[in-house]
Amino acid sequence: MALRFPRFSQGLAQDPTTRRIWFGIATAHDFESHDDITEERLYQNIFASHFGQLAIIFLWTSGNLFHVAWQGNFESWVQDPLHVRPIAHAIWDPHFGQPAVEAFTRGGALGPVNIAYSGVYQWWYTIGLRTNEDLYTGALFLLFISAIFLIAGWLHLQPKWKPSVSWFKNAESRLNHHLSGLFGVSSLAWTGHLVHVAIPGSRGEYVRWNNFLDVLPHPQGLGPLFTGQWNLYAQNPDSGSHLFGTSQGAGTAILTLLGGFHPQTQSLWLTDIAHHHLAIAFIFLVAGHMYRTNFGIGHSMKDLLDAHIPPGGRLGRGHKGLYDTINNSLHFQLGLALASLGVITSLVAQHMYSLPAYAFIAQDFTTQAALYTHHQYIAGFIMTGAFAHGAIFFIRDYNPEQNEDNVLARMLDHKEAIISHLSWASLFLGFHTLGLYVHNDVMLAFGTPEKQILIEPIFAQWIQSAHGKTSYGFDVLLSSTSGPAFNAGRSIWLPGWLNAVNENSNSLFLTIGPGDFLVHHAIALGLHTTTLILVKGALDARGSKLMPDKKDFGYSFPCDGPGRGGTCDISAWDAFYLAVFWMLNTIGWVTFYWHWKHITLWQGNVSQFNESSTYLMGWLRDYLWLNSSQLINGYNPFGMNSLSVWAWMFLFGHLVWAIGFMFLISWRGYWQELIETLAWAHERTPLANLIRWRDKPVALSIVQARLVGLAHFSVGYIFTYAAFLIASTSGKFG
């Protein structure tokens, strides 16, 4: 009996129904709830699993490098990055038949291949890789690192190498290691790579292990560093006529503040990027040494937090008690980490297209669209996760006595005001935005487009003007040619910035109008509503007006009838579940907006977006329907083409998405009856009744069925949009 799944819970292992399997899967990673768990084992298991996670990441990236080196066309792409389509890997068995083989043979390949829309070619090219041998070397190196991490993970589970709980709770040493050791040193190392390998590579100089000690990255070597003449490293930058990867028009500078973009590659100057990483390294190396570790100097985190009490006395006890609360709660720490990582991931999406760092990636439109959408979806899932673990913190780890009148307690005291304000903002945004869209829609339908309500986003335009955009005629700050800031910007700092802002060949400070104003507020509605649901879920996790006693019911209690006033949809889990739908909805609006605006920019018909985005039918007809034409083609006399796989995925994504509703809109009793009927029929059917099972089949619980429904909804939604995005963009631009 002891060997039945799940081994971590004897109670579940003895459950006679299929609930054993589902609950086992659901709680496999909830280490806190496992039998015989101690705080020490909990921390050690999580620590060891981090090494496994890193090993998988390095193995995966190694696989990317290996497959491109083996089956890709990196070397021919390097010769002509704008016209050769980068190959991700070969397709072993293209479906169906000879037409498929022909459709997928592209990018100069001899057989069927997949095109890469991940941007790895541009990244590898920018950082100095040039040959397949370079890629193989990188793949082997990462494979080696992966093995090291696997060994390290195993090692830290051995009795002699297991760290103690006190080691895990030593916050200052961890800050020292993470800030200085990981962020600081890795940023410094990356600066070194850019200066010693990537920048010479961009100037046609091939630096590798055999010659990197002989090639001076800068003609004056380390002289300017030791004599304090650091400005010499910025002199003689690459010229505007520089051809990337060659010495033609190249300079000698290694650390610059040029601003703007390299005219040929449309990406940030590599010397600016190196300078940025050096600054980051300096900041983090200093930051990591501000806290008191073994030497008795520096700040104590506990003292810092306890001293953070707002003067005047009307705002409570500030951060008092937070140190122990955070340091003893893994859920709080995970919540903070996820919130930070989620914001950073969304910022990556925003900056990868507006300030592209990799050579020629800005001209690879499908890759730009794929990377933006990918990072926004990832950010959404990570950010909702932050609130989920925040709610679990309140249920499992929050101690009211320890946090009396501090910022956490005051958040709970004021939760009604917080929730009602968020609710008001969401209602205001929703009704006004929808009202404008619907009004405009009706005006178009009745043939009186001039009666639309069109609002110019003057505040946003003013902000863009303040940063140097001249087309609105605001004549303020950096867009005012007579101002001191403008004149300083021509010479002292970032001289390329103003050119970049006012050029139409990039996505920096796009011109905005009434369509942008409306969709901006639609997105604001989505963000505020998602936040409302998540914040309410976390703040009401321990107890709410309807049910003040939630603590002992945990995170995901199900509907429990009318007792205690009814518990349907009031667990923290239910709030998270509802918020994910709103998150997906919001990111849908964000990506629709980004994609449609960029498609019209890239095609040179931006007036289509401007005119059609102010009413609902415009979005449905001129964005969704018009761009899905290649995906809803069905069978035609011309046979298949290279977009057929996306057409199939578009259909399949809709199917998966629709299956979600089968779990979301049905009652548990219906499933239980269906299961009983099927089991009864099975047991009375010859041959079939030879197969028996030990577990009595029972329907999923309400919470489980919602999870299965949500998973299908999310996966189907993303599959559908991914197929639409890649097919509609690559169909137009290759």
UniProtKB/Swiss-Prot annotation:
Membrane-related topology note: Multi-pass membrane protein
Pfam families given in the database record: PsaA_PsaB
Catalysed conversion reaction: reduced [plastocyanin] + hnu + oxidized [2Fe-2S]-[ferredoxin] = oxidized [plastocyanin] + reduced [2Fe-2S]-[ferredoxin]
Binding site for [4Fe-4S] cluster: C559, C568
InterPro entries cross-referenced by the UniProt entry: PSI_PsaA/B, PSI_PsaA/B_CS, PSI_PsaA/B_sf, PSI_PsaB
Places the protein is found: Plastid, Chloroplast thylakoid membrane
UniProt keyword Isomerase present: no
Cofactor remark from the record: P700 is a chlorophyll a/chlorophyll a' dimer, A0 is one or more chlorophyll a, A1 is one or both phylloquinones and FX is a shared 4Fe-4S iron-sulfur center.
EC number: 1.97.1.12
Keyword ATP-binding: no
GO cellular component: chloroplast thylakoid membrane; photosystem I
GO molecular function: 4 iron, 4 sulfur cluster binding; chlorophyll binding; electron transfer activity; magnesium ion binding; oxidoreductase activity
UniProt binding sites for chlorophyll a B3: M662, Y670
Purpose of the protein: PsaA and PsaB bind P700, the primary electron donor of photosystem I (PSI), as well as the electron acceptors A0, A1 and FX. PSI is a plastocyanin-ferredoxin oxidoreductase, converting photonic excitation into a charge separation, which transfers an electron from the donor P700 chlorophyll pair to the spectroscopically characterized acceptors A0, A1, FX, FA and FB in turn. Oxidized P700 is reduced on the lumenal side of the thylakoid membrane by plastocyanin.
NCBIfam families from the UniProt entry: psaB
Subunit structure, as described in the record: The PsaA/B heterodimer binds the P700 chlorophyll special pair and subsequent electron acceptors. PSI consists of a core antenna complex that captures photons, and an electron transfer chain that converts photonic excitation into a charge separation. The eukaryotic PSI reaction center is composed of at least 11 subunits.
Protein name: Photosystem I P700 chlorophyll a apoprotein A2
Organism of origin: Coffea arabica
Gene name per UniProt: psaB
